């Protein structure tokens, strides 16, 4: 064994061994308990960032630990390879998206191997290959035949710069999340999957997810948004159709003073023909912000359509307004407004001088004061005719029944969740497998024509999708009839909704999944990724699993038992102000800093002498130029050091502050372990440990070893507090480094302790542990070694701490044998000088003894 720790030599050698031995390749084995550990697959952007490294290190630690418990562990990896960034890069680099993507995959794969992640590379998938997306296309055609897929014209968020549709969540401050261009509203035909058909089950089954974070479950509950209410129909004077609204507060119905419709509603469109102000307003609404957060804060605007609706219970005429806060695609595109008891309706009514009618009493039974805001709390009705005096539930039922009796109302369960629009007007995605015949008939692509292959040898102009620009690509025949292919591609969330299942059988050619393999491995035991995916990917992931279950491919109801959302990685951020007032962000690597006595940054400059503004720690990002390249850190310190720091610096679900001083500390610790093993093994062979021959000090040290094993096992396995597990190992190492190594049993005990330490550290620092295990004479590769088991007998304390009181006041603490008698404890207490001075010259009148815990001497 060499004296110096040289990670660059060790790590490449160990990684080559894993590759040659195919150490982490697994197959189904009914004789072993399975464990499926999965980190969210990366987008091949070109280089790994520290967020990736944290995610995959957590996964690898869990997988290696479970493997050491003797389980059959699957830990696969792949590439979420379709998506818009590839198109931008292709235009910029004058290439096609495919070669750019495949080059990135090759580079990032090498980075993952350099970090020592124990993946089963035989299962690697790239979602942009026809071998993968052919099954997704086939499944889509089957969903279409089941009636779960449909096409309709829909108002969408349209980014004129990227020429694509954006989901509501991708609209930030009215602008595109990628390029910051102002988003427009546009009507285009789109394909949808009926996720709403599964809304109830998606909501209900959240209760089965005991090991998912409550925050994620709450976000999904709110996103699905189940509500119980009443759908009410209004007649409209001079308009051929009725208006239908949905309300969860029918108790306030007698206070409805106007209706509001979306700018795109047929009633508004008809009224605009003779109303220039309304026509201009409708035009303005085409660019309205549509993300819910934006709609909540934007200025509420509207125009009177001139139409009057008839209140079904009072017969009163109430105005119908077109308003920018009503959207056609939400509900019926019309809402009932009760300004006395809804703040949004109140603000709108106040602005335009509309009637505000209170119908709910304040909590103290008085009429509400509506001079400044609406009363939104539930309460007792007044001003409501026959319903006066009813509280919320009774009023809800009475008014719902009355409306039903008159044929103008119906109880209904509604959801905020909308069907999943899967069409994207981009090139680099899986083609949607649908065709249109010359007579307009729409059909799924026949199975013998699947996959519909995306041509990869294309020229990108940055404006039009190559498959839209090439009329020949769209031409095909179906059943001998000419047809045109769909030129939209799938939303990339389609690929990431089922990849976890394909990992169980990536080479299977008979269908989307080999049910036998899928049902052996699924559900995933732990899924690791960022909380930013809570309501998009993680909802579609659950939805797709249920679709595959109903297609007979899997038997479980949910795709993953546990979800672990890792925290973000933060780093220092610095900038200087340029000549034109712009901020120029400087990498923390290039910042020369001065710190105060507490280590806080007080001054900073860069190599060019610019005075830098320090903005504190923020998420590593390209925009702030504060990302730290993992490659540089691995080359400087080794992969094991980077991994250890990542797991030690913070609890896995909390933010991690990148500090190079912490990385240096992790490196020093590994060197200390190396040094102790080197010194120990240099002394030659070790005798067998004889537990019965150990001295009290040796027993105490062995007790510490086994208590550490118990704690680390609990911290990694049950609590998943990886940082405290590492802290416990570090604490034990301090004791081992100070322990005597002269006697035969000293060395035998150290041998047992070091073999335990190396195995406990193995999930975190696998390269150095692989090497040290061999040096310590461990049997076989450490990758196949069992996790150390705490010896219950060794952990039994043979002494205990007894608190000594005199007249009820604590005067000292004494260590006694566990089996000491009361007499022995009293004698030992009398020898303790802190206690003895209170007993001098007094008589002990009474003794209260709680064995092994407390001795109270009552004196007088």
From Swiss-Prot:
A GO-annotated cellular component: cytosol
**Which processes are annotated in GO (biological process)?**
leucyl-tRNA aminoacylation
List, in alphabetical order, the Gene Ontology terms for molecular function in this entry.
Answer: aminoacyl-tRNA deacylase activity; ATP binding; leucine-tRNA ligase activity
Classification via Pfam families = Anticodon_1, tRNA-synt_1, tRNA-synt_1_2, tRNA-synt_1g
Specify the enzyme's EC class, one word.
ligase
Q: Position of motif 'HIGH' region?
A: 42-52
Sequence motif 'KMSKS' region, location on chain? 619-623
Aminoacyl-tRNA synthetase: present as a keyword of the record? yes
The organism sits in which domain of life? Bacteria
* EC nos: 6.1.1.4
Reactions it catalyzes: tRNA(Leu) + L-leucine + ATP = L-leucyl-tRNA(Leu) + AMP + diphosphate
Q: Which residues bind ATP?
A: 622
Query: Mind telling me which InterPro entries this protein's record contains?
Result: aa-tRNA-synth_I_CS (IPR001412), aa-tRNA-synth_Ia (IPR002300), Leu-tRNA-ligase (IPR002302), Leu_tRNA-synth_edit (IPR025709), M/V/L/I-tRNA-synth_anticd-bd (IPR013155), Methionyl/Leucyl_tRNA_Synth (IPR015413), Rossmann-like_a/b/a_fold (IPR014729), tRNAsynth_Ia_anticodon-bd (IPR009080)
The alphabetical list of record keywords is:
Aminoacyl-tRNA synthetase, ATP-binding, Cytoplasm, Ligase, Nucleotide-binding, Protein biosynthesis
Localization recorded for this chain is: Cytoplasm
Similarity comment: Belongs to the class-I aminoacyl-tRNA synthetase family.
**The protein's name:** Leucine--tRNA ligase
Which organism's genome codes for this protein? Answer: Salmonella paratyphi B (strain ATCC BAA-1250 / SPB7)
What is the taxonomic lineage of the source species? Answer: Bacteria, Pseudomonadati, Pseudomonadota, Gammaproteobacteria, Enterobacterales
